[in-house]
A protein has these predicted regions:
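N-terminal alpha-helical interaction modules that lie
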Residues: 1-73, 91-92, 96-108
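Start-of-helix signal in alpha-solenoid helical-repeat scaffolds, especially tetratricopeptide repeats
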Residues: 32, 81-88
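Acidic, Ser/Thr- and Gly/Pro-rich intrinsically disordered linkers and low-complexity segments
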Residues: 71-81
Length: 108
């Protein structure tokens, strides 16, 4: 079976906006980049539970975005394509937040 083509997402809905602003999150709850940025901020100040909640939201928004753009659950999502970076960061933040709350199974 041939591998699928790499997914190249369109621009993140919150691209160019302040990802940490409440107004941005309220206007663009479908933005993985918003939730990834919020998770990263909360981890940096030690609020592991809130970081995990933001990261989990970002992960699910990422899956929604990938599937809406033809991803079938496998195949490359290159970080070199800038609009993919919010999705990839959201997935990475879930791993980091999971580790922070002691959920090793989710981290692995």
């Amino acid at each position: 079976m041939l591998a699928p083509k790499p997914i190249e997402l369109p621009a993140d809905p919150a691209a160019g906006k302040d990802l940490l602003a409440d107004d941005t999150a309220l206007a663009h709850p479908d933005s993985p980049a918003v939730w990834a940025a919020r998770a990263e901020r909360e981890l940096s100040v030690g609020d592991k539970l809130i970081a995990y909640a933001y990261a989990r939201t970002g992960y699910h928004r990422s899956l929604d975005r990938l599937r809406a753009n033809g991803w079938k659950g496998w195949g490359p999502v290159p970080a070199s394509h800038e609009p993919n970076q919010g999705v990839l960061k959201a997935i990475a933040m879930l791993a980091l937040a999971s580790k922070a709350i002691g959920d090793q199974a989710e981290y692995d």
